Amino acid sequence: MRSTYKTIGLWVILIVLFVAFYNFFSQGNDQVQEPSFTQLLTKVEEKKVQEVAVKGNTYSGKFTDTSEKFRTTGPAPDAAMLNQLRSNGVDVKYEREEQNSLWLTILGQWMPVVFLFLFFIFFMRQLQGGSGKAMTFGKSKAKLLSESHNKVTFADVAGADECKEELEEIVAFLKDPKKFTKLGGRIPKGVLMMGSPGTGKTLLARAVAGEAGVPFFSISGSDFVEMFVGVGASRVRDLFEQGKKNAPCIIFIDEIDAVGRHRGAGLGGGHDEREQTLNQLLVEMDGFESNDGVILIAATNRPDVLDPALQRPGRFDRRIVVPRPDVKGRLGVLKVHTRRVPLAPEVDLEVIARGTPGMTGADLENLVNESALMAARQNKERVDLSDFEAAKDKVFMGPERRSMIMTEKEKKNTAVHEAGHALLAKLLPGCDPLHKVTIIPRGQALGVTWSLPTEDKVNGYKKQMLDQISMAMGGRIAEELMFNEMSSGAANDIERATETARAMVCRWGMSEKMGPLAFGKSDGEVFLGRDFNSSKDYSEDTARQIDAEVRNIVVGCYERGKNLLTENIEALRRVSDALVEYETLDAEDVNILLQGGQLTRERPPPRVNAPPKATEKKDKRKILDALEGLPAMEPKKA
């Protein structure tokens, strides 16, 4: 409230000063002549003076011919002068002479300076967020989190048990340090959490803040860098000064790769503001001055670009990898996020956990949220299994685009393409089990064939790779067999098949001709601090052999898939016809069709393309009529 009154008062003062400033400088803007006293008397004799106001020795008035004002000084008026003025028809007025106040004179002279000074102070206060300090660019932007602010505990974290144990030990050290120091141990100075986006690194840090019971400072890595040189290093110093004053405490830096990338490499030059900030951070973490009681926790999903000096023991003593959750972890995450969601009795979270391999904690939270939104959209009291299935389809494959207009030819081609993928997924043993196939456009795809593994996979095997390449080419093969034509819809399939084959040859040593060798190195992104001058470690002849081997693998898988689909051409036709009729088939539907059965479930409502409007038909007819009357264009002569 006091801040509001101060702001209102400051605005009132500024407005008053502005009005006074304007009035002061607006005085005398009218055109006023200053003739000599002799010239004034001549004008009087010529009867060109309308009126004269006498104020001491000052004569002011207005001319008759030009209506312009004048002001001049002369001797004190006497009787002869007054008679001369009256005889020439001049209206004479007397005005009392006033003494100017000294304070008014000083105010008029110093008012512009005071106004500019107050305006500058007001501008700086607004620029600095009203902190009242002249310059606060070098101050840390770390936020001190209170215990009651969105409190998260380790009970809210699931799917990362080993990471929780490491961080719980940090919390235990802060609560009872003697338990560890009596045996000569010391508290870790820093903890670096690494993992894919969405695995729960920031959530773990929030859990530490809720459990530690000590001051917790939170800041982002990008908050250190500004356009002013030296600001980042100053903010690092200020951050650790705050930490020392509040020790024991925890400092959390999110996305530390924004400030902790490799030094002295990349296209950005050898020395810049980020490197200066990083150098100061290295000194503060482990320099001559000790930071006892200040624990630094950082999170990043790009550990490969961090500077080696930042990751050494003494700065980050512990490096915790936060992985994607397995089946058990996904079940725990689902239980955490469904605590406030009413579930139908048939919903089995363990089944959902098994059907969502590769999903992170953030993905699962989004899945639960989408399921709840879909149930609410249909006015349901509880979230049932169909809502989870629909949400899973939306998260994995993208939202449906039922309004997209497709011709019958495009629809049939898409059905044949997806039927080729689905049929090879059922026939090849190395492919993941088929889950669903649809020709409803989703995301950027016209159709989707979705396979789900039955368990989490750690390694890939050669036979599986070859089967996956054959399945990826199944869409192109089916188009060739059914229509004797090729479309551009297989572009992404061909790209994935080629990438897999090249990785088999160059990275995994799965080529019999090239042997168990690795060819080439990953150059990395030069802007991320990687080496700019990197070269191939093999000859041009070897490169030609690699290209030939990649081609042999892809073409061999193509021919294998073509033979399988040729042998099962009737099954391919049944699946494609069912896709045209039903638009979406699950694994059970495909099994029925492969066994020669017929589907008996209800058909979806047809998607009818909207007919053109009458006005559109008239406009098109006018254009065609106009074109018929034009002469044919002749080719230009060279």
UniProtKB/Swiss-Prot annotation:
Positions that bind Zn(2+): 417, 421, 493
EC number, UniProt record: 3.4.24.-
GO molecular-function terms, A-Z: ATP binding; ATP hydrolysis activity; ATP-dependent peptidase activity; metalloendopeptidase activity; zinc ion binding
GO BP field: protein catabolic process; proteolysis
Principal subcellular localization: membrane
Cofactor(s) listed in the protein's UniProt record: Zn(2+)
Subunit field text: Homohexamer.
NCBIfam families, sorted: FtsH_fam (TIGR01241)
Protein's UniProt name: ATP-dependent zinc metalloprotease FtsH
Organism per entry: Myxococcus xanthus (strain DK1622)
Organismal lineage: Bacteria, Pseudomonadati, Myxococcota, Myxococcia, Myxococcales
